[in-house]
Amino acid sequence: MSATMSGSGSAPCRFAHYFIVCGLDDETGLEPDALAALYQWLEADRQGKDPEATAAGENFDQSPLKRTFKSKVLAHYPENIECNPFDQDAVNMLCMPKGLSFRTQRDSLAPHFHSFLITREDGSRTYGFVHTFYEEVTSPQICSAMQTLHQMHQAEHNTSAQNCTSSSSSSSSSSSSSSMDSLSSSLDDVDSPSAHGGRRTCEGYDSIRDTLYVSKAMCLIAPMPFMHACKRFLAQMHRAVSCSPPPPLPLESYIYNVLYEVPLPASGRSLKFHGVYEPILCQRPGVGELPLADFPLADAFRLLGVENLVQLFTCVLLEMQILLYSQDYQRLMVVAEGITTLLFPFQWQHVYVPILPASLLHFLDAPVPYLMGLQSKEGTDRSKLELPQEANLCFVDIDNHCIELPEDFPQFPNRSEFIQELSEVLLSFGQSPEGGSSSPEPAVMSLQTSVLEKELKSTSLRELVDDKTNGNLGGEALDVLELLQGNPTLERLQALAKRTGVKVARLEALAAGQKGDEGVGGRSPVEEEELRNAKLNVQLREVFAARFATMFADYESFVIQNSPDLESWLTNREQMHNFDKASFLSDQPEPYLPFLSHFIETQMFATFIDNKIMSQWEEKEPLLRVFDGRIEKARLYNVRAPSLRSSVYQKCTFLKESAQAIEQRLRKIDHTAIHPHLLDMKIGQGKYQQGFFPKLQADVLASGPTSNKWSNRTCSTQRRVERHRQQNEHLVLDNELKEKYMQEARNLGKNLRQPKLSDLSPAVIAQTNWKFVEGLLKECKMKTKRMLVEKMGREAVELGHGEANITGLEENTLIASLCDLLERIWSHGLQVKQGKSALWSHLLHYQAREEKNEQQLESPVSNGQERRKTESSVGLPGLRVSVIQDMRHIQNMAEIKTDVGRARAWIRLSLEKKLLSQHLKQLLSNQALTKKLYKRYAFLRCEEEKEQFLFHLLSLNAVDYFCFTSVFTTIMIPYRAVIIPIKKLSNAMTTSNPWLCVSGELGDSGILQITKNILEMTFDCQNLGKLTTVQLGHDNSGLLAKWLVDCVMVRNEITGHTYKFPCGRWLGKGVDDGSLERVLIGEFVVPCGDDEGGRGSKTPPLQRSPSQIRRISITSLTGKGNKPTTVQIQESIGEAVNNIIKHFHKPEKERGSLTVLLCGEGGLVWALEQFFHHGFRSARIFQKNVFVWDFFERIVAFMENRDQTGDLQESPEPLSLNSESLCRYVNAINNMPRNIGKDGKFQLLVCLGARDRLLPQWLPLLAESPVITRMYEENALLRDKLTVSSLLGVLETLHDFPITLETSLTKSVEL
């Protein structure tokens, strides 16, 4: 109890919370690892056996020296601390992730260091630092047990060798294996004799001949990651145990000192405390500096190289699944901690396990973003490592210095300049940016040098013991090595050094009466190295931080803060938009967009914005406070000289300043902790045998001092600040609401669970998986809702109900995110891993079964899974709707090389066809296949959640996507075209030779000749994108050349998208306007749902688009008496011009077809045609139809006639130029070889006039010409000067925009 109480008060401000010893418990003896048994239980469950009946039996195939045995926490001090309860299972598992390791004198017995962290459920972290060494086994029972196990292994080995020949033929029958089996076997392959080239076969264990050693670990648990300080303290502790003579004080004194008398350094301060032999320094950054990060980034850059590390950094920012792979636990930790500290001001929000214990391999099955580290074994081949899911995985092979990236990976902005700046920082510290080299280990000393070192150490210790110095050492000046000065053995040691040719700088310096181990400013070489690492660390981090400060310099302007108080914000958190993403993206340089559009969708960015909003009512989150301070400082000093929209790279300006702050702290130590001293121990206590870590005196280590002025003062201050902050929080919100919403708001996304290491029962694992299932369903709901809102928002914009935004980029990001989610769902609980894409693998299994069934049936009738789109009334044959048919389309695309790419293409195609939910429902309807492929806990085997998931996907049928057509722009696509004549009024067929040319946003098909008397044709051509126009014509040959066409229908045979091109006009000489060729403007036919709700399987009736009326001659229009009013005509022109202006205000990739806005229904040509027709005189003169084009021709004839008689020369100069251009354009159109008819010619003139900015110049010529009086009534709009003047102003607004015309409109015109 006293331990708990003593720990609770001062623990938050203590340097270390616990000292722990883990290893072999002699009393319980050798125990198989319980977690390995749990793993067997899980595998038995997966294979459908009774897990309870599975014997835990011994694995005699494996050498006992290589088996996993249970380690135990042998001692930990203090017993418990209230603010950081001791988690025995987690600590034991992470101190010895593989359990106990046994070795003999033939093996390497070198100690090694690693660190770990434990993430608690609230997201807070505790750090552990472990020094593992080997201790001789003295227990006869343990040695005897190991001998017995070895003999059983030998017997098993001999038996299996005899049976090897007979079993080899049958062993190949089973081809499929569990992905987790493969993973564990690939990790264990190296334990087999062959993996080591037979190293172990003849080197067993003989208790008489061999000395047996077992691993033991010393561990410090600390609240902050002071890695270097803890590493040095533990190394000195081990030296004290392994070397002779013992240190001047009992080990308990040093442990007590570090646990209870060494405080945490305050912010912006440095601390010095004493280990067994040398002082240890550490320092903590100030409030305005980057937070503490003591893991050496230099090592991470050295291992991976700058380029790979930047790619890994980008993957982490985009919250992909990251798996680090290395033999060395510390390397895993260094890379994981290094990469997460570089995220400032953002924080990783998902599963974070830098060291994944072997018993937790099933956690790689998690269908969520994660950052995990997996230990490899020497000689393991990466190709054997089969992971449950790889579609969105970034695999980092640290030891081989390489990285495997996911597909569709956007690059970090200004990547090459960024890499260059980082390389310059590394080179300034003498480190190569290339990487690919291991951490530089200290050079191995020769035998003579180590002898000298030992003599040196023993001499210094003897002097220290003789000095009878207990309690605090005699001040700062008392350095252990100084005691050697004037020592009689010094000359002997120097003479020995000279004879052996070994140069020891320290001895020479001591002989000269100096401190030989001190470098610049009185620091030892170790301290110099630590200072260098700290300066390099902070400079590299500053470069990363500066990139974010530049990219998000104005982020605050786009934060949406519309809640009056914290309570209402928390209550409505999920329904609110907190950040104006579209406006933010539109403000960014174009090259940044692919990365930023993905990044602002991540959980870490959402949490960052949440923290910003909550800072209105609460104390600012520390990282946010530092980042905002940086931005404010940059504004104050006007560092950001280039504009925000510029993509000019700006280098970091804080490098020297940040390095100086660290150097100053280490040059002038702010606080020196109390020195280790004798404790209240009896005489004889504290003695121990050399080479063996002793059983410590628990009573003296159980609790700290009752009065420690420094810690009490500091802690009372900290407690007061903490209490004040909590009171403020409680004033804002009552406890109940806070409990309900606060965790959710602050930890959105964090609820996708850290693995809890302390409880790994099957029930807990099942519960964790169930939470994953719930998380996936919630994510699906949020993603589909977001896609619908974005898409509907865009359609509202197109209807004039909003503002144009960057939507296509966002849409593509959201679809890519949906593809990633589906891959994660299909990877969850996977039984058999085949290929990198779990979804595509499932589809291939389904395809194989269905095709086999089809062959067995041998029937041409399509089965229930395949249906045709219902035959439409206009002659388009039904389109086959089938999962397998769409798969075949993807399989025929040579451009896609990988399974992940094929799966994504299939998802995009199904989404575009509005069949995604239906297809996946069909795929999962084969329950036998699903059971074969997936474990019981898999998402796809949870019936209720699966149904909800499919329902959410079904909601996407409410909107139109072109996500397949717009992405795969180079593929060949089959199209089907049908010409539909008006049979009642003309011949269904024509004797002439018809042709058509289909054009789209990406190109055109070229002229396609249609077989006579055939109204339907299919053709293949490169993806045309969304279709815009069809040119339809014939050569006017034969007796029945006149042809009245209602419309042309064109369908993309892969996506099923159908376009209708209304005509309603004659093609033929001497009828209508005499056109032999018409340019038809297309409209997308929205598919109708059938009885299953949004299936989209039949072509709709033609009246689906009522706005498109048939284009008819002016004469028939006037005869019907449906003349538009003058106001309607003026409004239609204004609206047509406004739509064109809106078109150009959209981002270039989002603009769509300008041809529709010019020539389509309600377009500029249509509106001007209404204008020119208003007040047109009697329709029939000499029984001939009169068209607007006739008016233009007469104007031109009149001008040319006046020019010939000389009258035109008296006109003003500008009028002469305008007249000349009008004549030139009209004559060019009349002289072209195409027979496009008079209405077609008028359309072309308007388009050319708009393109070349000539319409406002021509309009006054038409209005002032004498010809107008003969062809227009007095009340005609064209004769109203005010109307003409206002129309000029409207048309002139188009001069600011570069109008380009499709070749289908301008073909053959020579100007």
UniProtKB/Swiss-Prot annotation:
It is a single-pass membrane protein. Keywords: Guanine-nucleotide releasing factor, Membrane, Repeat, Transmembrane, Transmembrane helix. Residues 154-165 have a biased composition (Polar residues). The chain crosses the membrane at residues 962-982. GO terms for cellular component: membrane. It holds the Pfam family DENN. The keyword Transmembrane helix applies. It is found in: Membrane. Residues 973-1081 form the PLAT domain. This is DENN domain-containing protein 5B.
